[in-house]
Amino acid sequence: MAMNFVTFNQDYSYLAVGNIAILEMLFSTSLVALILSPRRLQITNTKRQSTICELTFPTTVLAVRLNRKRLVIVLEDQIYLYDIQTMKLLYTIETSPNPNAICALSPSSENCYLAYPLPQKAPPSSFTPPSHAPPSSAHISPTSGEVLIFDTLKLEAINVVEAHKSPLSCLAINTEGTLLATASDKGTIIRVFSVPDAQKLYQFRRGSMPSRIFSMSFNITSTLLCVSSATETIHIFKLGHQDPSEDLPTSPIGTDSRKTNSTPRERAFSQGSSTLSGGDNSPTDGDPSDISSRKHNGTLMGMIRRTSQNVGNSFAATVGGYLPKGVTEIWEPARDFAWIRLPKTAGYGGPGSNAGPVRSVVAMSSNTPQVMVVTSDGNFYVYNVDLSKGGEGTLTKQYS
């Protein structure tokens, strides 16, 4: 059987695999949403082996999200919201072109938020299309990584998160609906914001080289964030205060790596010249005082940018202690707490690697310190992770 779609349910207790376009479960219930043909949705009761309802949409269904209150259907330029109890259409959202169906629905029934790329209005045009031409879209593809947070219970947009300077590639919301993780199409920086007030809480560095982010997942207690990408390394970031004096293991040197014998402050300055160049590494939001500090310290930033590669780590650490928070956070995102190295496969450097990277979906077990990884080449891996020391996870189970 060809594997066309794979996903975990909302609490990561079940894994759904199918040879159809889309398959989504509602927690551990018998309710399953199926996309059997591009525009047709079927809601099925697997216990009774009966079809509850079928819906047809004007264009291809790209994603389905559901919790105990809402069913969300994502098309390329529209999002449909349904009451999952009655299957009544509640609201239709017009979006910018979203061919990758980037969106996240909170599993929570109370904090029932939907996150998706902020629609970007098309600029006015003086060109008048002929009468027989189809109507032009009111939105264009996003050029930045802003996220709109929509309350699916009140049916209203409640906030905008200025997450990244480049377009988004992945979004994830935690179990309680209080945290939002974001990644841009560069994939070097992962950010975590509070929901619904959109305050930036954490900023992590996945690696120094751009890479497509395939999957992000919070653990059930929202203390860890797991991220998979087009590289063979799965990164696990710790949410919460980390003591800079802690001597944690570090992931191997490479595109997803860092220096292994330096302090967090020294590591920050070792990459200062590259991160100060802007792009996805620069924060796009912050307190007004932080922004003001950056403006008034522009000369100092320029000096450090030119000389950071030539100064010693001890001097860099001393200077770094005097920099305002708004400046230091530009090049000081936290590194991974733990990591996993997937086995070499056809998509990760093995024979036939020209086929392209293997896509992966990650989740963390709700009752054991384990990370579950499913890859598009049909492998299911389970890794143990040391929650006290971090470091590299160990492979304990493998299925194919």
Curated annotation (Swiss-Prot):
Pfam family for this entry, one: PROPPIN
Subcellular location: Preautophagosomal structure membrane; Vacuole membrane; Endosome membrane
Biased composition (Basic and acidic residues): 256-268
Domain of life from the UniProt record: Eukaryota
Region named Disordered: 241-296
GO CC terms in record: endosome membrane; phagophore assembly site membrane; vacuolar membrane
Biased composition annotated in UniProt, kind: Polar residues: 270-284
Keywords assigned: Autophagy, Endosome, Membrane, Protein transport, Repeat, Transport, Vacuole, WD repeat
Chain ranges for the short sequence motif L/FRRG motif as given in the UniProt record: 204-208
SMART domains: WD40
Membrane topology, record value: Peripheral membrane protein
Keyword Isomerase: no
Family stated for the protein in its record: Belongs to the WD repeat PROPPIN family.
Function summary: The PI(3,5)P2 regulatory complex regulates both the synthesis and turnover of phosphatidylinositol 3,5-bisphosphate (PtdIns(3,5)P2). Necessary for proper vacuole morphology. Plays an important role in osmotically-induced vacuole fragmentation. Required for cytoplasm to vacuole transport (Cvt) vesicle formation, pexophagy and starvation-induced autophagy. Involved in correct ATG9 trafficking to the pre-autophagosomal structure. Might also be involved in premeiotic DNA replication.
UniProt protein name: Autophagy-related protein 18
